[in-house]
Amino acid sequence: MAAKILDGKAIAQKVRDEVREGVARFVAAHGRPPGLEVVLVGEDPASVTHTRSKERMSNEVGIRGRLRALPAATTEAELLACVAELDADDTVDGILVQLPLPARIRAHAVLDAIDPAKDVDGLHPVNAGLLAMGRPGGIAPCTPVGCMRLLAEAGVELAGARAVVVGRSNLVGRPMAQLLLARHATVAIAHTRTRDLKALCREADVLVVAAGKAKLIGGDWIKEGATVIDVGMNRDDAGKLVGDVDFDAVRERAAWITPVPGGVGPMTIASLLETTLRAAEARVAKR
């Protein structure tokens, strides 16, 4: 029996509707909308598309989303000055610096300069540390948060489940594992250099794949009845957008699966909007 499809577009719309209602309550209580600043250095076509989408969708739910497009020649010092300005602006609740940055700019220096309370990408060491220690008050990266919402919408019981995360990036793999641990799953982190990766994946009740390798996971890598979350975004030889999972083969064994496109992607931006609202609420609550 073919797997059920976890429709990220539909669930993302549900999240956006919830955020829109929350923003309206925030404005009524505080007289201003939550503010999100997206900072872009240069004119990389993919980054331009992503940042404009974030700006547009923020404004659609009532968040004051603004894109700061800086020249490609921007120096690290100039970018740090921009971040410092946004840190000091009380109307800004969320700051997102679009990655990747030009090679001459140290990404860690820029990310570390963002006020942790405004770090809606969840990449500041303070937020990463709080998440790793299982302590409240931090901000988790948006893609793993979106994946957790997908699992919740599918009604997947995580407590006691065997979860395998293929990928170890700071943006997806590592925080995804921490969020699953917090829900009492038994978690293994793997990657493309893991020995016997196929055997490990076959043990997973929940498999989250963020390896960045097209169709890495085949149908015979999947435990019957598993839930498969495909975070990958790749182009095949024909230029078609595909995930890290061989969708047609895997859906014959899985119980639930996310498509690419239309699965995790829409949830990432929806989760960014939700995170921005939560950051705004947390900031005003501390005053």
From Swiss-Prot:
The keyword Oxidoreductase applies. InterPro entries: Aminoacid_DH-like_N_sf, NAD(P)-bd_dom_sf, THF_DH/CycHdrlase, THF_DH/CycHdrlase_cat_dom, THF_DH/CycHdrlase_CS, THF_DH/CycHdrlase_NAD-bd_dom. Keywords: Amino-acid biosynthesis, Histidine biosynthesis, Hydrolase, Methionine biosynthesis, Multifunctional enzyme, NADP, One-carbon metabolism, Oxidoreductase, Purine biosynthesis. Pathway: One-carbon metabolism; tetrahydrofolate interconversion. It comes from the Bacteria. Gene3D superfamilies: Leucine Dehydrogenase, chain A, domain 1, NAD(P)-binding Rossmann-like Domain. GO terms for molecular function: methenyltetrahydrofolate cyclohydrolase activity; methylenetetrahydrofolate dehydrogenase (NADP+) activity. NCBIfam families: PRK10792.1. Belongs to the tetrahydrofolate dehydrogenase/cyclohydrolase family. Catalyzes the oxidation of 5,10-methylenetetrahydrofolate to 5,10-methenyltetrahydrofolate and then the hydrolysis of 5,10-methenyltetrahydrofolate to 10-formyltetrahydrofolate. This is Bifunctional protein FolD. It comes from Sorangium cellulosum (strain So ce56). The lineage of its organism: Bacteria, Pseudomonadati, Myxococcota, Polyangia, Polyangiales.
